[in-house]
């Protein structure tokens, strides 16, 4: 009985230590959610506005830009998959990888060869384990991405998109990331990044006429400058959405782990109390039995 009681107490201490770790990780993730949400909210208007401006510029020029031109017979598509660098985030990375797998199958059915770009250590590990070649592998910034991180990935994608397919380039670029909806809801989504889909027109302000823009030095020059910024901003927004989703998923996972640890501690505590009671009962029985034996001998 004494040995069983010691084992339960050892298990309780082990679970209590684990609970401290998961609780700390839960609090850290919760503190990061607010910052990540603020960054997401700040990035969305810029991404939307640059899309609107590019559409306005493109509507006033007849020159077809490489980043907005549909390829007649696309044969190769880049798939950028954004996951986490670390684990303990529930199904966050696995859901993104599952959505990427569905997209890859769809592209193959359309006769397009998928070219994979992994953002986050989980994606890189997943594809390397399965022997899938990677055109790009980026790690180290999944939780707190910077604009320079997005630019590094965007530069590689633009280079691939502007390179002929016979020289290893791609005809399309698709982005798989996790969209942040709320602290309880995050959705793995797939969006086509390039060629950019231009809006038909702007909504007239307050029912008035559409704005008539003047561009210096020219609409074409403005388009050349803005389109790379569009790719960078869209990619940066996706990284921020994913970072917020990762923190939310990790906070939920760690809260669940903490709750499970509390339940396990209660279970072990009850078992230890029973073992202690059984040990006391046994000791009392032995004392009473010994006393009775002495009385009978007397």
UniProtKB/Swiss-Prot annotation:
UniProt keyword Coiled coil, yes or no: no
GO molecular function: ATP binding; proton-transporting ATP synthase activity, rotational mechanism
Transmembrane feature ranges: none
Coiled coil: none
Annotated GO biological process: proton motive force-driven plasma membrane ATP synthesis
SUPFAM superfamilies to which the protein is assigned, alphabetical: ATP synthase (F1-ATPase), gamma subunit (SSF52943)
Complex and partners: F-type ATPases have 2 components, CF(1) - the catalytic core - and CF(0) - the membrane proton channel. CF(1) has five subunits: alpha(3), beta(3), gamma(1), delta(1), epsilon(1). CF(0) has three main subunits: a, b and c.
Function: Produces ATP from ADP in the presence of a proton gradient across the membrane. The gamma chain is believed to be important in regulating ATPase activity and the flow of protons through the CF(0) complex.
Alphabetical list of HAMAP family matching this protein: ATP_synth_gamma_bact
Protein's name according to its UniProt entry: ATP synthase gamma chain
Organism, as annotated: Parafrankia sp. (strain EAN1pec)
């Amino acid at each position: 009985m004494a040995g069983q009681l010691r084992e339960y107490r050892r298990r309780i201490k082990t679970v209590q230590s684990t609970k401290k770790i998961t609780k700390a990780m839960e609090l850290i993730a919760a503190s990061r959610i607010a910052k990540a949400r603020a960054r997401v909210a700040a990035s969305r208007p810029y991404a939307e506005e640059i899309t609107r401006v590019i559409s306005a510029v493109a509507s006033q020029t007849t020159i077809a830009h490489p980043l907005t031109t549909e390829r007649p017979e696309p044969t190769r598509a880049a798939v950028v998959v954004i996951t986490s660098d670390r684990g303990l985030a529930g199904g966050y990375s696995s859901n993104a990888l599952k959505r990427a797998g569905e997209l890859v199958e769809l592209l193959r059915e359309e006769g397009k060869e998928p070219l994979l770009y992994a953002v986050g250590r989980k994606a890189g590990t997943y594809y390397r384990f399965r022997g899938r070649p990677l055109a790009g592998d980026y790690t180290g910034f999944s939780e707190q991405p910077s604009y320079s991180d997005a630019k590094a990935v965007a530069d590689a994608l633009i280079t691939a998109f502007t390179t002929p397919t016979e020289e290893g380039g791609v005809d399309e670029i698709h982005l798989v990331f996790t969209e942040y909806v709320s602290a309880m809801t995050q959705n793995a989504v797939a969006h086509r990044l390039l060629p950019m889909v231009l809006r038909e027109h702007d909504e007239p302000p307050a029912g008035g006429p559409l704005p008539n823009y003047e561009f210096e030095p020219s609409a074409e020059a403005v388009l050349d400058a803005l389109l790379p910024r569009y790719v960078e901003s869209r990619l940066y927004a996706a990284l921020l959405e994913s970072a917020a989703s990762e923190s939310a998923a990790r906070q939920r996972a760690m809260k669940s782990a903490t709750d499970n640890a509390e339940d396990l501690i209660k279970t072990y505590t009850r078992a230890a109390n029973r073992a202690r009671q059984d040990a006391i009962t046994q000791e009392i029985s032995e004392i009473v039995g010994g006393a009775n034996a002495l009385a009978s001998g007397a």
